[in-house]
């Protein structure tokens, strides 16, 4: 259930109290090799339990995790034409990998089109995000089954879906490799770091130098153990909040899909975004983004980035006020 509140007070997501306390304690233990090693080991074991993968490594960013995954691939790399992290393209270009783009339905992958494009482009890998543009859940299990049959490595960026209670997303049963950022304001929110998990240990052997160059502080590892415990709750509350807003706001995209933001079509997204930012302030950050943009959707729209908000803000009265303000402003901008 979504909780009640007396008034709207929104704040940008930050690491939880338990996470901050664990990180503070770990900082006091710096220099003790035995304790530092234990923090790293415990975090990696927690990640393996969460992802259902046999191997996991914690690194200094989500992009480092992507770099490790791509360094094991000779190409071509298949990317959706929208709705995925722009870092996929930049890192593939940096590594000199050939990129092919998969046509999608507003970021959502159609399995028949995917099958045809695999036959045409013969990619070695497909990189996706669990939610297309954070907006709509991809059919990850079905994508994985198709890729597995065709000999294509599926890499899932699960930054926004880790801890999925339904086990459809961020699950090693449905991805050859999982990568994620644990920076702010991700589901596992440590303000820094990332991870990569897989059942194939050769991936880490082949990228040993990058792994060494991407080592993370044991302070982050200590925080990760605590943050992982809260990941299913954090994701569930965010999904519930988005589902509530999709029902309350007049016109939204992907109403029937799970997602961690709410996207509104608009004839003038920049102006509409400015008005929403004025009326829906967020302490310490923001929650409004505008499209078209590759990592969301390639059409004029405004996104309410509910994923950016601290979980404590996702109370019914806050959400109702967000929906009322949004409905009032957006009536002049819907396409």
Labelled PLM ranges:
Residues 1-18, 22, 294-335:
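PLP-dependent enzyme catalytic core of the Aspartate aminotransferase-like
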Residues 2-64, 82-90, 167, 231, ...:
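Conserved N-terminal alpha-helix of the aminotransferase class I/II PLP-enzyme fold
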Residues 69-119:
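Conserved PLP-anchoring active-site segment centered on the Schiff-base-forming lysine
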Residues 77, 204, 268-277, 311-322:
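Short, conserved charged micro-motifs
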Residues 173-207, 218-221:
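Active-site PLP attachment segment
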Residues 239-243, 253-280, 288-302:
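Conserved glycine-rich beta-strand-loop-beta hairpin in the small C-terminal domain of fold type I
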């Amino acid at each position: 259930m979504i909780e009640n509140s007396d008034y709207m007070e929104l704040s940008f997501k930050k690491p939880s109290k338990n996470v901050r306390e664990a990180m503070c304690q770990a900082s006091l233990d710096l220099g003790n090799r035995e304790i530092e090693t234990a923090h790293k080991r415990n975090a990696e074991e927690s990640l393996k339990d969460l992802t259902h993968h046999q191997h996991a490594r914690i690194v200094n960013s989500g992009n480092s995790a992507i770099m490790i995954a791509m360094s094991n691939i000779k190409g071509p790399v298949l990317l959706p034409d929208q709705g995925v992290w722009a870092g996929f393209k930049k890192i593939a270009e940096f590594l000199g990998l050939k990129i092919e783009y998969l046509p999608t339905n507003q970021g959502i992958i159609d399995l028949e089109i995917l099958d045809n494009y695999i036959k045409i482009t013969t990619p070695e890998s497909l990189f996706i995000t669990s939610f297309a543009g954070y907006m709509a859940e991809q059919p990850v299990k079905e994508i994985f089954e198709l890729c597995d049959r065709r000999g294509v490595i599926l890499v899932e960026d699960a930054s926004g879906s880790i801890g999925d209670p339904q086990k459809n997303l961020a699950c090693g049963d449905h991805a050859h490799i999982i990568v994620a950022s644990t920076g702010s304001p991700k589901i596992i929110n440590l303000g820094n770091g990332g991870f990569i998990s897989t059942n194939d240990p050769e991936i880490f052997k082949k990228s040993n130098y990058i792994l060494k160059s991407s080592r993370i502080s044991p302070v982050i590892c200590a925080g990760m153990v605590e943050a992982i415990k809260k990941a299913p709750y954090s994701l569930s509350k965010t999904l519930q909040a988005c589902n509530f807003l999709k029902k309350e706001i007049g016109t939204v995209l992907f109403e029937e899909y799970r997602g961690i933001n709410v996207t509104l079509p608009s004839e003038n997204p920049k102006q509409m975004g400015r008005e929403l930012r004025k009326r829906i302030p967020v302490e310490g950050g923001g929650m409004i983004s505008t499209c078209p943009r590759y990592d969301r959707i390639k059409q004029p729209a405004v996104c309410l980035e509910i994923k950016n908000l601290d979980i404590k803000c996702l109370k019914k009265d806050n959400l109702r006020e967000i929906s009322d303000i949004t409905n009032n402003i957006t009536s002049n901008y819907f396409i």
